[in-house]
Design a protein with these regions (language model features):
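Substrate-binding pocket helix/loop in short-chain dehydrogenase/reductase
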Residues: 29, 57-58, 62-70, 171
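Active-site loop-to-helix junction immediately N-terminal to the catalytic Tyr of the SDR YXXXK motif
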Residues: 61, 108-117, 129, 157
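Active-site helix of classical SDR
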Residues: 81, 119, 127
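Short C-terminal tail/terminal secondary-structure segment
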Residues: 107, 190-191, 196, 202-215
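A glycine/serine/threonine-rich, flexible loop-to-helix segment
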Residues: 136, 148-175, 185
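Alpha-helical segment proximal to the catalytic Tyr-Lys
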Residues: 86, 132-136, 199
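Active-site loop of short-chain dehydrogenase/reductase
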Residues: 14-15, 42-43, 88-103, 136-139, ...
């Protein structure tokens, strides 16, 4: 999958430095940023788009599973933000940090989402706190909070079988736009937050959710 993403980017004329690593320690995150600096000379934009979900009722979830979700969604976002911040501060020209939250950071869910909801609420907290902390430096920190988007993890919701149809209908009843999200729907918010157009925005959570959280 990483090779395919790299190939797609190169086909669009972009230079690519692909690293197949998990940002699980401070040292690894520093190495990721250093690789970007080595290849491109500097780092101006960080997008932390990885994440994990583990759905289970609280009485059936082992603490290790809860902590694993928190590590993937919270700790690794924090570590990457820290590594990028150090580089951006050294460069002295500001920068853009974009984290990936979720509508579940704002809203609960009855189907066993305690780990995921808690982790995305924490991402929102990191975003707001860093927005305040780094505001004077010219580094903006914002997050995008999607709802259900087409991805390998949600592909089943886009199917035509009875389970998907029933689940989708119940969910879409709360989405004013009347459809699920497509990857293209994230392009605009990402471009905005990565560009000079968002220079006066920091500490914000941008809900790319078709109006789901408005009701």
């Amino acid at each position: 999958e990483l090779d395919q993403i790299s190939a797609n980017c190169k086909a669009l004329g972009a230079e690519v430095e692909a690293l197949n690593v998990r940002p699980s320690t401070e040292a690894i995150c520093d190495e990721i940023i250093a690789a970007g600096v080595k290849r491109f000379g500097r780092v101006d934009i960080l997008v932390v788009a990885s994440g994990k979900n583990d759905v289970s009722k609280i009485d059936q979830m082992a603490p290790e599973r809860f902590l694993d979700v928190m590590d993937a969604n919270v700790t690794q976002s924090w570590l990457m933000a820290k590594a990028a911040t150090k580089q951006m501060l050294a460069q002295g020209q500001g920068g853009k940090i974009i984290l990936m939250s979720s509508a579940r950071g704002l809203l609960g869910h009855p189907a066993g989402y305690t780990a995921y909801c808690a982790s995305k609420s924490a991402v929102d907290g990191i975003t707001k706190a860093l927005g305040c902390e780094l505001g004077p430096t010219g580094i903006t920190v914002n997050a995008i909070a999607p709802t259900v988007f087409r991805s390998p993890l949600t592909a089943w919701m886009f199917a035509d079988d009875e389970k998907a149809t029933t689940t989708r209908a119940g969910f879409l009843a709360r989405v004013p736009k009347g459809r699920l999200g497509e990857p293209e729907d994230l392009a605009g918010p990402l471009l905005f937050l990565a560009s000079r157009a968002s220079d006066f925005y920091t500490g914000h959570i941008l809900y790319a959710d078709g109006g789901y959280t408005s009701g």
